[in-house]
Amino acid sequence: MRRTAAIAALSLCAAVAAFVPQAQAAEFDLVVETTQVASGLQRPTAIAAPDDGSGRLFIAEKAGRVRVYHPTTGLAAAPLVDVSAAVSTSGNERGLLGIAPSPAYATDGALYLAYTRISDNAVTLARHKGGTLTELLTQEHATHANHNGGQIAFGGDGHLYWGIGDGGSAGDPFNAGQRLDTLLGKILRLDVSCARYCVPADNPFVGVTGARPEIWATGLRNPWRFSFDPADGSLWIADVGQGSLEEVDHLRADQGGADLGWSCREGTEVFDATRCRTGASYVDPVFTYRTSVEGCAVIGGVVYRGSRFADIASGVYLASDYCTNPAFAIRANPDGTHTSARIGELPIQPTSFGTDADGEIYLVNDLPGQLHKVSFRSTAPRASCTVTYRLLSQWGNGFHAEVVLANTGTSPVTGWSLAWTFADGQRVTNGWNAAITQQGAAVTAANASWNAAIAPGATVTFGFLGSKTATNTAPTAFTLNGGACR
């Protein structure tokens, strides 16, 4: 049976055929680079950053320890938390698999953990606070050692999301992905502000006869890492395939109840027609690639929303594969489509991505036990350009602006990303003719699928509505694909 977990002990896989993404391909004019910043980790499985102003990263190790890294002091020798006495590591895929600091970690010090329980191998969600470990929710998982899932993360709604695999073996022997009476093969949504947990009243299966109300999304095989885009609250999910396709799914914040298809489908292909429900609506993946041809197990990543590379990489979702360690870049387009490309290679055996409090990306790798910081470099030729920013109207606390970008060079621009910074706390609320994102004061406008090319001497125009306070100073400095415009 094909190894299906991202954390299995493997030597580096043999060279594979050239990457041919099954999703829409596009050039990103972008290369990923990494810098090793720490070593000595023991099979790291997850990365999370507390929102406490400390600049720290928490890193889970499979055996049950949570380590602390700081960019100034490095990797601390003593663990922050050690729950190894509670954690089963039998089988390659069991262990401490997920960590999530409370959104109020600075005041409550609560750290949420997902692991396999040593007494019976049940997948377990627990809270560690004040030195006490409290179990919140478990799901029986003793029959097979693989497909535990384990990712946990808080959404922008303040609720905790937990991904659980289908129960293991191969072919979904319990038909868990398509059943609503089990937590296997699902992503859950929980309110953990209660003593243990409560079910949010707006969960999609609340009140559905026979359904577990904790469920938020169904049809998953082994979700090995999901993450939220802080810009819009959407959820990116990487689901490890059976033997044909690895997939990445992208759900809007309002798509609770989505069925991602397993085990009726594997990626976009029918896996077992007898498990396809009549009248069911399955959500297609936004990216797939061939298992055993281009890799072995997808490793889900994160969307870049940092400031250091905002002008060239804002909105890019970065993922990889355990065996072949490519850097897959995927971007959501304004029209609902997605573009993808391979933009380099990452360190061998990547197991998890995470971001620091500033949105900068890190990754860990399995047996090498290293922490790496990710950076981006533009490969696009520096454009000659001018920008005209026009304030068309303003009222009370709002305004309407238009931006005209002109290519003053002698070569065409074949994909553009224009960046600027607001000085007075302005916020973009709605835009058109460009994909506009904002992180703090930094704004990035990227081309739509139909206006990516700007010929020499040509212009492209986009506009937006925004909110403001008393002052509304127009920006004067713009960068196009990393180069300054006049």
Say what each PLM segment does:
Residues 1-25:
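Secretory targeting and sorting signals
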Residues 362, 379-486:
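Extracellular low-complexity, O-glycosylation-prone Ser/Thr/Pro/Gly-rich "stalks"
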Residues 351-379:
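Blade-level signature of beta-propeller repeat domains, shared across WD40, Kelch, NHL, RCC1
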Residues 57-81:
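Beta-propeller domains
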Residues 26-42, 282-292:
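A short helix->beta-strand "capping" segment at the edge of beta-propeller domains
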Residues 52, 60-63, 94-96, 104, ...:
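Beta-propeller domain segments
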Residues 40-55, 88-108, 143-160, 215-232, ...:
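Beta-rich, blade/repeat-based domains predominating
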Residues 122-154:
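Asp-box/WD-like beta-propeller blade repeats and closely related beta-sheet repeat scaffolds
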